[in-house]
Structure formats: structure tokens, C-alpha cells
Amino acid sequence: MGKRKTKEDNASEDYDANELMIVPGEKRKKLEKSGEKSATGGKKNRNFAKEKEVAKLTKQAKRKLAAVQSRKALKQTQEELFAGLAEFQLDPSKLCQLSSSTKLSKEPEKAPVFPEKLKVFSGKTKTEAKRTQQDYYPTDDESSSEEEEEEEEGDNDIEDAGNTVEVKIEPIDLDDVDEAIDGNPETNLDQIVVKREDDEESDNEDILALPTTTVINRKKVIVERSKEIQKSRAELPIFAEEMRIVEAINENLVTVVCGETGSGKTTQIPQFLYEAGYASEGELIGITEPRRVAAIAMAQRVGVELAKPDEVSYQIRYEGTRSETTNILFMTDGVLMKEMEQDVMLKKYSVILIDEAHERSMYSDVLIGMLSRIVPLRSKTARPLRLVIMSATLRLDDFTHKKLFPLLTPKVIKVDARQFPVSVHFEKRTPDDYIASAFRKTCRIHETLPPGAILVFVTGQHEVKQLITKLKKRYPVVYETDKNGEVLVKGTKEWKEKKVEAAKSIKLEDFKEETPETEDFEDVDDGLMDGDDMNERGAAEAFDDYEEFENGDGDLSDGKVENSIGAPPADCEPLYCLPLYSLLSMGKQRRVFDETPAGMRLCVISTNVAETSLTIPGVKYVIDGGFEKRRLYDSITGVSRFAVCRISQASGDQRAGRAGRISAGHAYRLYSSAVYQDFVKFADPEILSKPADQLVLHLKSMNIVKVVNFPFPSAPDEQMLESAEKRLCRLGALSESTKNGKTEARITKLGKTLAVFPLAPSYAKFIAMADQHNLMSHAILLISLLSVREPLIPVSSLRGDTPEETKELMKNVLKERRRWCSHTGARRLGDLKVLMHAASVAEQIKYNARECEKVGLRVKALVEARKLRQQLTNIVNASCKKEHAAALDSDLPPPTDQQAQLLRQMVVASFSDRLARRVDRSVGQEEVQKGAYETTLIKGHVFIDPCSVVFTEEPEFVIYQELVQVNEKKLMTSVCAVDKEWLSRLAESYCNYGEQDKNQEPIYDPVKDMVVKTVKVTFGPLNWELPNENRSVPHDIMMYRYFALFLLDGLVFEKLKEYTPKLLAPPSTMVKSWAKLQKRTEMLLNKLIEKEVTTRSSLKEQWLKNENWLLEEYLEWVPESVHQQISLMWPPLEDHEKTIKMGRNKKY
């Protein structure tokens, strides 16, 4: 405390004071980087900067300084060299379009270039340009001193999670970095980002979240083509875009190619990718088509152009040519969906092309949604997957929105079509009858305008036939024979030349009366007559509809149009009229592609099938009626109907574009421009207008529980998806379960079985049930016929040469169909039996077109049904373990009475939602039309189709396959009669059960094997009354008491009945309020509760495990005198129910 300070102490205090004065000097980092040690002490006011200048450099420092100076000199020389080369550099706008072959697209698409720098190191670059690709390279970190750098060399590399720019990857000395900064004061220091430890976690999350584009060095393929093929390819608009398209696909995970129909997208892009090496390492190039015809035709065309038909295959619903040598595979979108169920990552494919995406079919929309999640996952593997969406319209928002592709932005490439200019002509006033207007417009074009094919768009087959009939009548094909015996067609160019020559050498004696021979150019049995389907309008009464059709309606039928435009010119050339619609046979559809007879003008009358699916050659004039016939489906009620609706603006533009394929054309729109402006821009996609049951089931089978959250390009209505889930739950394909307070519908074992079949779930269930009674062949036959469109020609569409012949033909066909199901047992199977017999008749006559048409069969639909039948047979044999494989029997015998009854019961179990009940006209004051039915789906009355074989019988309950609205009526098609008593047992999920009467005594139902009470039963929301039903009592202690009562009473096991009179207490003791006071009742009750035994089957299971189970408890109820007898008999099963081991472990 009182110690005196010495001189040394004072010196120490001075030293400490000086130390405090130089502490701030440590903060100057640049001094630390010089390599000299910092001061630790010294004299007061010491000048360290001056001492550093005069200090001698060590040998090591001199070497480092010399190295730095040499690098600076080298850098200056290289900068001068780069400055000289920059004079010969391409313009940046052209340079960005080229792709480097040395970097293999490791850079982002719009990577900034730094030509003024010698070297560029990796690091985060703050730019506004949006990056679509990322690679992560290590880079050197800055250290606080050179000594720390030498000590920690190799440990300070970091991984940058930002966008990187890499010109040359090599080790970089920090001295170079310092010199670059010092020598270039304009360098942005923010470009050099040092990762901090606290940023590591977030950067890792970014790496996982954002997909990367890995470009693989693929082996290019050289293809040798003929000169003709090369010339035809060069004429396509897309051919000049090969480099741009291939580079975009290489550098982007998803690419959208937009080009007009006919630009060559479908045939050329697969060849571009093939040559780029996308199939060089055993992977496939997959192309999906919405139609089977397109898949087959495109595969054949690409195979010819590549000169390698073995490497280009197709796979459609019923057939395919896929083999081990296949490299390019065309398929329908449904085929790829089924393949995705087995391999969700599509590991066999290197690229998937979705063609005709603008048509928005249900499967293509689901495929795009699935691939939008698969592509980012595959990008993290060694073999990434590319997705190419090809569309013919500019509606691209549906394919690029963020909900569909949240982690990336698809690259959009627009291909300009080599379209000739098309002049679009609107009507000043929209006509009321567009058919009459189309007829007038066709006549004026044919009579006044230059040559060129005419394409007329109408709504349906009825309009096609009506217009062709009038045009053929006005412009018939007339044959004349000249004096040399040569047959010529009147009006053709050759005929006119012959007339001129004949006029020069005319003589009076050559004149004589001749009658020209007039006949149709086509045969009488042209598919035009037979292909009509007036059932779209309806068939209230067959011949009445026929007369209405023949009489016609509007101006076109009464001759006013012909009178208004006058007679055609005498030398007018004939008009070669052809129909085109979807139900026309393939052979007759192909006639529009054949060469037009010489001297005639082609005129195609078509539905909207010619809008995008087919390109008709030579079309110069298009007449657009502005209407189309759509099949509208109510997702809630299930009612479908055909309705004539206005087209969309996109459809109108597609139709007009058909006129500009070969030369400048004209499009005549039979509506005003104001009406066109009122059209919707785009039609609703198919996924919004079709039942979603099959869609939901397929998504559930892929473990997609929340279908509502699926990334659809155009999301269906939530109510539509929920209704589909409810129907699937009632069908047994889904089951609802609650987890964490949330109710979810998950797929069941039955649902997984149904998802195997390419059918609606109700149809698939019908086949799944058929194996129980050896009805698989009959079930497959019936479902294949129900799955195709109209295998039977509607009676109202049949035609004869005269009205009398037509009436007789309708009568005979309807009589023949009723004869097919005249057998007593099969009659109630109704129209389903007619379909099965029709297939048998078609097999017998070998699907001969003429013979089938005589009995009212549509050959095209029956052939399609046979292919589906073969496919379903193969699926059953491959997927189901059966002792006897199902066979495609062409001589399948008709179902017997018992089989017909079983088939009707299967119909009830599978199609319960399509039940209808006949309205009792004697009940209620409202006047009800005869033959009216009511159904659970819609309000109002429905009726059986008059052409149905059960039309006259009017069963009380029927099940239909479809409701079709015809005029003011809703008609049920494919009707089958069912029994009322089956509903509560086979359609239990649709039944409503009343409350059990508390005063009613339960009984044991040996059929259901449960303790039951009788309750009232009603069906559906309309509460149709059904016979009373026995329902299980609540699962509580009283259920166990009553089961024990019936067990003691001998009602459960017949062998115990003889001991009932000998019981020490009546069995009713079990249900008394004081029963727990007796030991025997509690012992028996507790034993049953312990194993939860309330049925005969569950009790039998316990005896199979332990044959003495419940013996001790039962012996408490009987006298001791019968104990040994009961012990020998126990368990009281029938002899055939006992196993061999029973009796070895008896207790006596």
C-alpha cells in the first residue's frame, strides 16, 4: 500500500503510455498485408512509416516483388493484345446468338462478358439479368495477411450459391486480385462476395430449390437423306430454325415452340433432336399425340425422312411397333400416362415432346402438370430430362404461369409460318340460316372465282349430308359420249375443247336426238348416306324423324335459295363433293387427300375435324359458318348433350388459315365482324368439360392425395373434383380417412386394381367383379362395346332408296334387334344383350361393311371395340393371377339365364349412380307424360330411347349408360332392367337407412352373420322406398350380450340347439339388467369381449387357433352330466368345417 515508486516503475509507466499511443496503428490493414511485423513497443514518438521505407528488403520479399512486377508487365502486354483483337470482334448483338462449343453451355444464357480483363474468378455477380442456369465453382477467399494465406492454403475455398460467370477455371493468386483492383479503379468491389458462415445454410437451400440445367456432350448423328426429302424439308418454315430450337432445348429444361399448323413441328423437331444426339446413348425421344391416327402417320413419315424406319416406332392404345431398336417413339398421351405409373421419372427418355398442346386434351394437360415436377427432379441427376411443348396457337400463358413452373421460366420460341396472305371477308349482317348462306356462297365461288378447292365448315353430320345433297343436285356429274366413242364429263376443260373442235366440223346429218346420261360420280352406297348420325338431333320416333329430315327446314329445303341465285351456267364444271367427319371410316376420310378427278373442283364439307387435325391439300377458299357442335357435360348431374355453339376466335383464325397453304386465299365468314368480337378468345380445354373420375383415380394411383393442388395448366373446378372423389368413394375405389383433423381420400386396393385398366372406373369395376362367377369373357365383351361410340347405327339414321324402303328398313332392323334378346332371361338385360349379340353377328360376317350396314351395325366402331377387347384381355391375363387365362373367343356363346342375372347384378354394383325409377302416374295431381322416369342426378323427367328394346316394357327400375338431351327430352341410352330387391345389398353406399327402433328386439341374421334390427330403407336424394333391410345393431356391450343369447339358443351353431333345453338358466338371462350378478353370464360375456367376437365367422377363427376356446365358459351353463359329451363334440362346427388337427388337444 505505502510502497515507494522506483525509477524502474516510472519507466514502466512511460512504456505503457507509449503503447497506448500506437494501438490505433493496428487497424490499418494495408500495413499488415506488407508482410512486416507490427510494433510491440519502442521509444516515444517513433516514426514507423519512415523506418519501413529505409528498411532493407529480405531476399524473400525481393523475390515476391519481382514476381509481381513481371506479372504486371505480362498483363500490360496481354491487354494490348486483347485491345488489338477487339477490333475484329463480332457485334455483341450477333455474338450473343452464337453458342460456344468449348464451354458446353456451362454459363448462364445471358452471362456478362469481360473482354477487358485477363482472368475472371468465380463469384456472385449482382446483375439484373434473370438467370436460368447455375453451376457452382470453388473460388479463393481473401485472407487478412499473406502468412495466413500460406498457412491455410486450400482451406479457404468456398462454394458460391449465386450465379457464376466462368471464362477459365484455374488457381488464382490473391496478389493478382489485389493488382486487378488496384490497377482498375472502376472495378466494382461488390462483385467480389465472400461467403459468411451465417449465409451457408440459406445458400444451400437455394441450391436445393432451384433446378440446374446440365448440358451433356452428346454424340452427334449424321443422317443421309435423298434429295427429294431434303428439298421437301427445306420448304418447311421450321427448317431454318433448327439451330435456334436445338440450342434452346439444350440450354433450357422446358421449351415452348409455337408455330402454325403445317409449319413442320411434329415431323422435324424429333429429327433435329435425333441428329443432336438425344437418342445416341440408348435413351428415347418421346412424342405424344392426342390422336392415334396422328401417332401412326407421323411415325411413318419421320421414319421415311430419316431413312431409318426401324428406329421410329409408334405405340397406341391397341397396338404398336416398339422394339429394342426404337429411338424415336410416337404415342398417344394416354400411353405415356400408363407408362408413368410404372416409372414416374421416365428414365428411358431423354426428351418428351407434347404435340398439339393447344387442343388441351385431358391427358396432355395432366402430362404437362406431371412433367412440370419431374423435369426439375431429373435435372439433379446425371441424365436430365427435357420437356418441349408444341402449340399451334399463341395461348401460351397456360403453359408458362408460375403455378405450373414455379422454379423456372420456359423458353418460348415462335416459328413464323410460311403462310400466304388470306383475305378475310365478313358478312354485313349475320344470316339466320347459315346453311343456306353457306350454300349460296359455295355456288358463287364455284361459278365465278378461279380454280381452287373449297372447304366448308358446318356443325354436324346432318348438315354435311344436307349440304352435299343440294350441291350434287345443282352440279351433277354428267357424262357425254362424243362421236368417237370417248366418254367425257360435261363442263370439264377437255369437254370444252372437244366441243370447240366439233363445232368447226359441224354437219347437219350429224344431228340426232341424244339423251345425256346423268349419274353421281360416286357409288350409290357412298359412305355419305350411311355415316349420318341423326341421333345427335334425337330419335323420338324413328320414321317421324326421317320424314322431318327429308322435308328439311329453313330456306335450303324449299327451293328459295336456288331461285334466288338462278340456274348455274351451262358450261359450269362439275363439283366433286366429299364429306368429312369423325365417324366416317378411315378409307372414306382419306379420299380428301386423293387427287381430284380432272376437270373438277374439290369441295369438302366438314365438321371441325378439318380445323386442326387434318390439312387438306389445295384449299384456296374457306367458308366458315361460325358454329360447332360440342358435347357439353354437366360435371355435377352427369348429363351430356350435344349443343350447337359459337366457335372461339382462335378456331376462326385456324379455319381461315387453311386457305393460305398453297397460295393466297380467301376466308368467307358467315357472320359479321361485330359477332366475331363477341366470340371468346379460346375455347375451354377438354379437362374442364369432361367427367373427372378417371383423371382423379389415376392421380390418386400415383400417390397424389390432394388432387386440388395438382399443377394443371387450367385447373378444373374444385366442386367438379370433389364430386368425382365422392363418386369414387361410393364405388369403393377411394376411402376417406381423417388425420390431424384433415379428411383425405386415399386409394384402396380395389382402386389400384381399377387404375390398371384404361377405362372409366365404373367400367373397370365391372370387369374386376366378373372373375367371381367366370364371366370375364362376357364382361370384357360388354365393356368394350360400351366404351366405343355408337356401335349400333341409330334406327332413325337408316336410309333406303325411297321413303317406303326407308320405313321398311327401320322396321326390320328394330324387329331384328328385339329378336336378339327375345329369350326370357336375357330380355331384362335389354340393350346390353343387343350389343353383345351385335358383336357376335359382326364376327360371323367377318366385319363386312355391306353386310353390317344391312343389320344396322357401324363397322368402324365394332372394329375399334374388338381391338379394345383384345387389349383388355391381355391386361387381365398379365395383371391378374388366374388359373385359366381369358381368351378372345370369336364364338363366345350368349349368356345363359343365370349368367344374364349375374351380369345385371354386376351392372347395379358398378353403375348405381345411373339408376332411374318409373314415375307412378296415379300418385299426385301433376300430369305426367307416359313413360316418364325420374333419376337421382337431375330434376325433371327422363325417358327411355324409343329404339331401345325395353321401351315397351317400362320396367320399374332401370340403369342407363348415358343421358342425352334431344330437343326437349332427355333420353336414356343402353338401358338395362334391374330388380328392386338388389339395391340395398348391391348399392349400399347410395341407400339411406332409418333409425333403429329401441323397442324392437334384435335377431340373428345367418345370411349376413350379424346381430341385426329391421330398419326402413330409401334410395338416393329422392328417397325412393325400398324393402326393409336388416342392419347391424350398434357395436356396444348389448351387441355382445345378444350374440351370447343367440349362441346359447342354438341359432348360431346348429349343434348347440339340442342342449338349449338343458341350460341351467334361460339364454334371455344374458340381456337382463341383473345378469352381471351371475357368474356364468359374466364369464361368457367377458370372454367374447376379450376377443371381440360378435359373429359366427370370428368365433370360428378362434376355434381354429384353439379348439377348447369358450368351452369352460359354456360348460358353466349346462349340467355336469353332459360335460363329457359336450367336451367330445367341441367345437360345435360342422364336420366339413373342422380341421384334421382338431380333437388332439381335447380337455375332459
Swiss-Prot record:
Residues 1-10 have a biased composition (Basic and acidic residues). SUPFAM superfamilies: P-loop containing nucleoside triphosphate hydrolases. Residues 138-160 have a biased composition (Acidic residues). Belongs to the DEAD box helicase family. DEAH subfamily. Residues 1-51, 101-163 are annotated as: Disordered. CDD domains: DEXHc_DHX37 (cd17982), SF2_C_RHA (cd18791). Residues 246-412 form the Helicase ATP-binding domain. Probable ATP-binding RNA helicase. Pfam families: DEAD, DHX37_C, HA2_C, HA2_N, Helicase_C, OB_NTP_bind. The keyword Kinase does not apply. Keywords: ATP-binding, Helicase, Hydrolase, Nucleotide-binding, RNA-binding. InterPro entries: DEAD-box_helicase_OB_fold, DEAD/DEAH_box_helicase_dom, DHX37-like_C, DNA/RNA_helicase_DEAH_CS, HA2_WH, Helicase-assoc_dom, Helicase_ATP-bd, Helicase_C-like. ATP binds at residues 259-266. One of its GO terms (cellular component) is nucleolus. GO terms for molecular function: ATP binding; ATP hydrolysis activity; helicase activity; RNA binding; RNA helicase activity. This is Putative ATP-dependent RNA helicase rha-2. A motif (DEAH box) lies at residues 355-358. The keyword tRNA-binding does not apply. Its EC number is 3.6.4.13. GO terms for biological process: maturation of SSU-rRNA from tricistronic rRNA transcript (SSU-rRNA, 5.8S rRNA, LSU-rRNA). It catalyses: ATP + H2O = ADP + phosphate + H(+).
